[in-house]
């Protein structure tokens, strides 16, 4: 059994087709727990109609309002009891083999330890009806390939086991996003692997954003050359500090050393920061060179502008 965790908010334009794509999955042994965060449109009405059609959908009506998508996902996750879990975004469309392939990729692993397997997606411009490119261009599987990204894997592309769920249900004070928590937990407290397949349509519109997404060469170059954003985003850094406060004593010594070096670099000289990058295996998008270029082009630490 796989539990699908769906956090909704004002998703009336997209939610129905996403729920129908879940119903069309070739893997049938699933349940979907849905929690709405106070929508003022027809999202809840649409969900209730689907629940009446398929008993595998469960709308959680507990009057809890988080006003934060990451916290909403983690709250909804607390209702899961199955061995495996998938997050689900309200505005994507899952290809029919998504659950089947993700389950096949994780079920034979050592599930006595926390496990995550993530996949990719097709970028979909629903307004122009264009499908092109991969949604994810970064594939972090360790601390040094994650921390400078200022994002995590695409949470809705992943499957994880009960051991990982137990980690995610331990609260951290500054939670930037649920999928960042999933990523850093996989990189430091368990095992995280990439399945080289596109298993859903990632809808691109003005209200969503996924770090490290594919686009035209001109757009990618423009984003890469931006100098008004810092190399280390303040919100992700605060989330890292909160994570380390809770889980620091459970990390391997090598990972703990890397996180400590990363945290300490905020207050160090430019030279020491640069030497840290060169002495380790720090990278973005699998490339140290790209990280070095950004290092010299951007402020080191701060918020996004």
What are these regions (language model features)?
Residues 1-215:
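Nucleotide-sugar donor-binding/catalytic module of glycosyltransferases
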Residues 175, 181, 203-305:
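C-terminal subregions of glycosyltransferases and related glycan-biosynthesis enzymes
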